[in-house]
Structures are given as structure tokens and as C-alpha cells.
A protein has these predicted regions:
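Acidic, Ser/Thr/Pro-rich intrinsically disordered cytosolic tails and loops
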Residues: 1-192
């Protein structure tokens, strides 16, 4: 009986506590990671109106995306921001640094998936819904009835990014006015 109890306890530690500890450690790594020298400069070349504070805000949005991927159990996520996707693309070009980042942050390589909006394609919707959920939770926003957008979903609109994705937390008023082009945060909570 003592052996069985010890083995059960060991299984709990190895199966529950260690993975949670590792996830928390990886999340802290993502939050505090120092970007490679010159990365934000490269983003600013693509977006000449950006000041360093703007690039830093975009980098916070990219961190939010990486955290959503990690906290979802490394399940498929879609990038909801064009400007954060631009920074992700630049980061990938620092191949050694990106590979090392992925190994420490996720335990393996995170392949790039293009920025997308809510669509007819179920897999893309699942990825957007997942990143919406975790970004909302990260910022203490109710994902079903949001009163504001999480940073990652607000970036393109904030910076008026060409071909960017514009989201609204709640589109009831927009729909009443006949605007069907808006992407609505509350729609991400819909399971359909």
C-alpha cells in the first residue's frame, strides 16, 4: 500500500505539477524575452510612421499571441493582426534566435501561420477563437461579452495598418446600422 501511494503521488507530480510548472516557466520566458538587436528597427522600416513606443506595443501584442499559443496547450492558433504578423515574420528571419526562442518557449518550433480573420473555414475560426479566448483571459476581459478588445486584436486599427484587420468588441450597434464588414469580438465566443 505504501508503494502504491508513493507511485500515485509521483504520477500526480509528474503528470500535473511538473507540466504546469514548466508552462509557467515558459510563460515567464516569453514575457521577459529580449528581442534580437535590430528586430524592432526592421519593423519600423516596414512602417515608417512608427516610433519606438509603437514598435514596442506591437511586440507586446506578439508576446500575447505567443502566450495564447502556449496557454492553449500549443494547439493551433491564428494570427489576428497584420502588424503583429509583420513583426513575427521579421523575427523568423533571425533564424537562430527564433529557433532558440521556440525551443525555450514551447519545447519545439512554432511554424508561421498567416494572419486571418473570421471566415467560413472552420480551422481558421478555431484558431482565432482560441487566440481570442486566451488574449481576453490574459487581460481580464470577458470573451463572451467584451467591453474592449485585447491588445493583439486592437493593433491594426490603432495604427491604421494598410490591409489590417479591424475588430470591435461588440457589434450590435454596427449591425443595427447595416455595417456587415466589421469583425466582432463577441462573435469569437460563438461555438458555431
Amino acid at each position: 500500500p505504501v508503494f502504491a501511494t508513493v507511485m500515485s503521488l509521483l504520477l500526480v507530480v509528474l503528470g500535473v505539477i511538473v507540466p504546469k510548472w514548466l508552462q509557467l516557466r515558459r510563460a515567464e520566458f516569453i514575457r521577459t524575452y529580449r528581442w534580437p538587436r535590430g528586430l524592432l528597427d526592421r519593423l519600423e522600416k516596414h512602417h515608417p510612421a512608427f516610433q519606438r513606443k509603437d514598435s514596442a506595443l506591437v511586440s507586446r501584442g506578439l508576446r500575447q499571441f505567443f502566450l495564447a499559443y502556449l496557454m492553449s496547450g500549443k494547439r493551433y492558433v491564428s494570427m489576428p493582426s497584420q502588424v503583429a504578423d509583420d513583426l513575427w515574420h521579421e523575427f523568423i528571419l533571425y533564424t537562430r534566435e527564433y529557433d532558440a526562442f521556440c525551443r525555450r518557449a514551447f519545447g519545439g518550433f512554432l511554424h508561421h501561420a498567416p494572419a486571418v480573420v473570421l471566415s467560413e473555414h472552420r480551422k481558421s475560426n478555431e484558431g482565432l477563437r482560441r487566440v481570442w479566448w486566451y488574449c481576453c483571459k490574459y487581460e481580464n476581459i470577458d470573451p463572451v461579452s467584451p467591453t474592449r478588445l485585447p491588445l493583439l486584436f486592437a493593433l491594426d486599427s490603432k495604427f491604421n495598418v494598410a490591409n489590417g484587420f479591424v475588430y470591435h468588441p461588440d457589434c450590435e450597434a454596427l449591425r443595427k446600422n447595416g455595417s456587415g464588414a466589421a469583425h466582432c469580438g463577441g462573435d469569437f465566443a460563438d461555438s458555431s
